[in-house]
């Protein structure tokens, strides 16, 4: 399928996509706050600027978009156009995250990843968020 935008228009559109304050991030943060957790968001003091840092529990949470991290769900596929570029980009994202997670674990943090697709369906979302709370509490 061809792109409906020109190359310059596509670049402009892609520049407007931000990596913070996504719907999945806001959903997870609101849930955690409602559950009584206090946290910092996108804390630059830690490698990889985790989406959520729960210092009291020595836990960081990353909320990953399935497309950007090549998740095995149906949203994690490589686009048919410019395949080499996207394959390289997504591979680098994954490699960088493995390195960052290793560094965070070395300094004593538990790393939890929540996938975007786990938050789409209400029943699955509820289960995932409840499991997240258990994972955080088990980290202590």
Curated annotation (Swiss-Prot):
Q: Which SUPFAM superfamilies match?
A: Restriction endonuclease-like
Q: Does the keyword Iron apply?
A: no
Q: What class of enzyme is it?
A: hydrolase
CDD domains annotated for this entry?
Answer: Vsr
UniProt-listed Enzyme Commission number(s): 3.1.-.-
Q: Name one GO biological process term.
A: mismatch repair
Q: Name one molecular function that GO assigns to this entry.
A: endonuclease activity
Recite the UniProt keywords alphabetically: DNA damage, DNA repair, Endonuclease, Hydrolase, Nuclease
Asked whether the UniProt record includes DNA repair among its keywords, one would answer: yes
Q: Which residues cross the membrane?
A: none
Q: Point out the signal peptide segment.
A: none
| Similarity-based family | Belongs to the Vsr family.
Q: What does this protein do?
A: May nick NmeAIP sequences that contain T/G mispairs resulting from m5C-deamination. If unrepaired, these mismatches can lead to C-to-T transition mutations. The very short patch (VSP) repair process counteracts the mutagenic process by repairing the mismatches in favor of the G-containing strand. This enzyme is an endonuclease that nicks double-stranded DNA within the sequence CCGG (C-methylation site unknown) next to the thymidine residue that is mismatched to 2'-deoxyguanosine. The incision is mismatch-dependent and strand-specific.
| Protein name from the UniProt record | Type II nicking enzyme V.NmeAIP
